[in-house]
């Protein structure tokens, strides 16, 4: 544990127990859904985390999934503590950062966002879910791996693996022998009782027919059989998608921002810390 030089009352802890980090993220379990899943015992060795403490209590935390090449990182907490967390707690050259709106400027003191997406985290529970499956949907597993890669593109080959399709929930719609729409869970946590739906995609020629609604509904329905909360992410300006998810019973929980960020040069970080400039 090291004392932060600019904020002596905040300490950066690089070795906090996973249980302590989980307890902190549980304060907003819906927003921290992905991080909670990454703290499950079967996933915990794929990630690392660092926290900011004040008077011994965690006031901010960040978690990075190291096994994924795009380096997804989630962070939440008090603004000043987040700023110190990214200044002193990590030196990663590039991250995909997701954080509540208050974290944006704090993180920008050390990282420059190349793009910022304004997002909603939505949630549905069994009591509010309204299934809408109007097409024949097929549960997808390892045997359908090549079909999924054909839909999502060859770049997805490193993401979609037999183990992932065995672990997660995926449904698709076929036209003949070709898959034309699919959706699935990004992560699931039985320990936290939460699942995150995503990767909703329909081939261009088949859009506007409600296929995305059908596959999202099928994934959500099965996820709710095993998890109390099911969440998803959607861009705030994607009104059609928000409408689809709302009809399924999803509600907006909270906004957040997300985007690729690169670490600022030392002189740039010093300039921002001294003068508060943004770019």
Regions found by a protein language model. Give the residues of each.
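Conserved beta-strand-loop-alpha-helix junction that forms the acyl-donor binding cleft
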Residues: 98-103, 231-242, 258-271
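Conserved catalytic-core motifs of GNAT/GCN5-like acyltransferases
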Residues: 114-125, 251-269
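Conserved donor-binding loop and adjoining core beta-sheet/short helix segment
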Residues: 6-12, 23-88, 183-198
